[in-house]
Amino acid sequence: MAKSQMALCCMSHSPLLNLPGPAQELLDDIEGAIAAAREFVAAFDPDLVVTFSPDHYNGFFYRAMPPFCVGTAAAGVGDYGTYQGPLDVPADLAIDCARAVLDSDVDVAVSAAMDVDHGTVQPLQKLFGDATAKPVIPVFVNSVATPLGPMRRVRALGAAVGTHLAGLGKRVLVIGSGGLSHDPPVPTLATAPPAALDRIVRGVPMTTEQRQARQAAVIEAAREFASGQGALAPLNPDWDRAFLDLLDNGRLAEVDSWDNRWIAEQAGNSAHEVRTWVAAFAALAAQGKYETGNRYYRAAPELIAGFAIRTAVCTS
């Protein structure tokens, strides 16, 4: 079988892209960068998409929180105005991928009924216009629910997935979704009130009123953060740019020594979502050297995020 052709697109996500509040200039600037990435993806025209993405207690909960999970079937939950309904997941290809990862000594769970939120669906909609436009294998990377595993295991996951994908003889796009520096209001085991605790542990569904209240809280938190108020950790553009430089220059192995506490201290608790970028770049790097393009970055307090985009193709 011929070797696969692979390409990559990593991008930040934010529920606030679909909510009132951010200035139109900011939204237009980000949309322009996304449009360029969309053109890159359209020109590549993948046969298969593999997403590495986090979850925000919409599909994975503390009753059983895997570090990694491959979905053999998946559906969007429809949070923050994103698509609700089944994705086009090729079950046989997904289970083969999971088996290959396990054979590579990386422990990964399998879900035959994976619920995915805006972290997975938003980039699919932004890049393809329709979350169901392409067959997709969703790979969950825990980036929120501590304790988290070491970064070297994330890179090992990506490398194992990429090695497997290289042998499929397809045009494969890998997507990493999340980051960069940001510290949005997310409940934790230590601080969550009873209702939120039931949700993040047992997966108790949110009522319509609770979803509306959470959305309003996110909008208010972003407004306060953009005005320099509130208790959220500040963005760290220097850290973000250093991370992007590491990726641009093929120094991915350096993340193996990163300490989880250091990441949170430097860039906020949800900066751990850069794990999805590490996994995606490791998957691409499994084919050889790569070159990045569509290099976009903007510190965006109105989105509570350092917002970045990268595309990449193999050069070897």
UniProtKB/Swiss-Prot annotation:
Cofactors that this protein relies on:
Fe(2+)
Sorted alphabetically, the keyword list is:
Aromatic hydrocarbons catabolism, Dioxygenase, Iron, Oxidoreductase
Q: What does the record give under GO molecular function?
A: 3-carboxyethylcatechol 2,3-dioxygenase activity; ferrous iron binding
Q: Cross-referenced Pfam families, in alphabetical order?
A: LigB
Q: Which pathway or pathways does this protein act in?
A: Aromatic compound metabolism; 3-phenylpropanoate degradation
Which reactions are catalysed by this chain?
3-(2,3-dihydroxyphenyl)propanoate + O2 = (2Z,4E)-2-hydroxy-6-oxonona-2,4-dienedioate + H(+); (2E)-3-(2,3-dihydroxyphenyl)prop-2-enoate + O2 = (2Z,4E,7E)-2-hydroxy-6-oxonona-2,4,7-trienedioate + H(+)
Q: Which GO terms describe its biological process?
A: 3-phenylpropionate catabolic process
Q: Which InterPro entries match?
A: DHPP/DHXA_dioxygenase, Xdiol_dOase_suB
Q: Classify the source by domain of life.
A: Bacteria
**Active site, per annotation:** H118, H182
KW Iron (keyword) present: yes
State which Enzyme Commission number(s) the record gives.
Answer: 1.13.11.16
- Subunit composition? Homotetramer.
Q: Which family does it belong to?
A: Belongs to the LigB/MhpB extradiol dioxygenase family.
Spell out the HAMAP family in the cross-references: MhpB (MF_01653)
The protein's role, per its UniProt record: Catalyzes the non-heme iron(II)-dependent oxidative cleavage of 2,3-dihydroxyphenylpropionic acid and 2,3-dihydroxicinnamic acid into 2-hydroxy-6-ketononadienedioate and 2-hydroxy-6-ketononatrienedioate, respectively.
- Return the protein name: 2,3-dihydroxyphenylpropionate/2,3-dihydroxicinnamic acid 1,2-dioxygenase
Report the source organism. Answer: Mycolicibacterium vanbaalenii (strain DSM 7251 / JCM 13017 / BCRC 16820 / KCTC 9966 / NRRL B-24157 / PYR-1) (Mycobacterium vanbaalenii)
The UniProt gene name for this protein comes to mhpB
